[in-house]
Amino acid sequence: MAPGSIASSDTSSSTSSSSTSSASSASAEGSSRPLGSEKPGLARGAVRAPRRHPPVLRMVLEALQAGERRRGTSVAAIKVYILQKYPTVDALRLNHLLKQALATGLHRGLLIRPVNSKAKGATGSFKLVPKDKRKIPPRKTAPRMPGQAEGKDPKKPSESKKDPANTVEVKKGSRKPREERAAPSKPGAAKKAPKKGTQTKDPEPRLGEAKKSSRRPDKAAQAPPSAGGPGGKSKVKERGSRQADTKAHRKTQPGSQSSKSTVTKGENGAPLAKKKMGGKVPKEAAGEGPKAKAPVPPKGAGSKKEPGPLAGKAEASKGPRKPGIPTKSSVSKAASKKAEAEG
């Protein structure tokens, strides 16, 4: 082989080996680099730039503190203050953000409107509330995560399932009073049983008889007051006639011990008879005087033997008295005097 051909083959092999070595070194470097070391693109969200201004509500509070007035600060003055102090604020979005900030300030009790203000929304004027009078409303708790809510929600249905069990227990408890209500009905049946017998009916007529017996003494008690009525005069007349008869009988008896006689008193006493007779005593009896009274007969005398004629005389005396006819008592006395004269 010619020497020139050998040299050309050596150079071609050296160039191929160098190319393979460079490729292997490049592959080794690529494998040694970490996968996440590549810089993320702008679409994935680059690092946020720092805020160019504080929250709008804080800026509003600063504006109100800077320009405190008696009647409050207008919304236009607040907006001018914010744009001058924080020029980086977007003027186009500021109107919307300012409206939200004022609403939240009123809700939290940080801002108030003047007394006579009737404005609404992002209009009118506002004032700061003093720190002493601020009322911080309770903050709302953070909403639960969906996983936690799913884990706790199933417990609520279990509680709701327990409630029907409680209602069943309440129903069972309500049945017991019904049984108790049914139990008192048994004494009612026992009350009905005695009605069949006659023992319960006996006390009622007995009570009726007792009432009748109690009424009878009332009538008897009412009888004595009637003595002073129209029938009382007839009874007094009967008593007077009986006394006159007893006097005449005593005078006719031969075995009388004394010439004096005592006047027998009735239930109401002899003075009643004297009052009724009054000045109607006949002259013959008045002439005899008190000494002409008949002697008192013994206890077994004949005053008791003549109940029949006395009853008849009493019945006769009940009739109407005529002015011209003398009383029977005077007739009986006259007859007794004739008998004495004949004796």
From Swiss-Prot:
Q: Which SUPFAM superfamilies match?
A: Winged helix' DNA-binding domain (SSF46785)
SMART domains, A to Z: H15 (SM00526)
Does the UniProt entry include the keyword Isomerase?
no
- Residue ranges with Low complexity bias: 1-32
Basic and acidic residues biased stretches: 150-183, 199-219, 235-247
| Stored CDD domains | H15
Establish whether keyword DNA-binding is in the entry.
yes
**Composition bias, kind Basic residues: at what positions?**
132-142
Q: Where is the H15 domain?
A: 52-130
Cited Gene3D superfamilies: Winged helix-like DNA-binding domain superfamily/Winged helix DNA-binding domain
Q: What is its main location?
A: cytoplasm
Q: Which UniProt keywords are listed?
A: Chromosome, Cytoplasm, DNA-binding, Meiosis, Nucleus
- One CC-aspect GO term: chromosome
Q: GO MF terms on file?
A: double-stranded DNA binding; nucleosomal DNA binding; structural constituent of chromatin
Q: Where is this motif: Nuclear localization signal?
A: 161-176
**Name of the featured protein:** Histone H1.8
**Organism of provenance:** Bos taurus (Bovine)
Q: Lineage of the source organism?
A: Eukaryota, Metazoa, Chordata, Craniata, Vertebrata
